[in-house]
Amino acid sequence: EFLKKRKEKIDFCLVGEPTNPDKLGQMIKIGRRGSMTGKLSIIGVQGHVAYPQRANNPSTALVQILKELKDIKLDQGSKNFQASNLEVTKININNSADNVIPKIANAVFNIRFNNKHSSNSLKNKLNKIIKRICKKNKSKYKIEYKVSGEAFLTKPNKITYMIQDIVKRITKIKPKLSTTGGTSDARFIRKIAPCLEFGLVGKTMHKVDEAVSLSDL
């Protein structure tokens, strides 16, 4: 945003993210999958287990929704991207009583998606499923989404191959052009310029005693 305000133009950007799995020179990132988290709450009617007709168990709708979301085949992947994937990361009913039907059931899921989707297209798809199942179960719901980044791809060009050749010349390894992994800071700069990512080996990133090889530096 700062560069946009200054109307600065960048021809190409090389981002120094830790792109290499085991050895320096293995991988150059030419894009990244998008990431979106959904926080879902199903609201039912609390009651006694012995009198289910007087209650509405939100966990019933929640389980049905999560199963359908997990069973969706969002796509088959593409030439540059692996298939999009949804994972349920939290389920919480927060009910301390064994014989009480809860009022609220919560879950969190995360989607890593390729460039066949946008966060908005995925929201529309998921919301239809959630709405349909909640209507069938006569339950209410709340859904909040957080988008960490959209999927993007820098199509290989002469600069890509130049960098690939330089890396091979120095490391004696021809780097693979890849879009695997999580989001990165390249998602910010790609809005104003084509970019690639190449950096150190990421085996210990975010771990205790994080370290890199001096020779790699």
Per-range role (PLM):
Residues 19-23, 30-31, 36-217:
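Metal-dependent amide/peptide-bond hydrolase catalytic core
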Residues 1-31:
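Acidic/histidine-rich catalytic neighborhood of metal-dependent amide-processing enzymes
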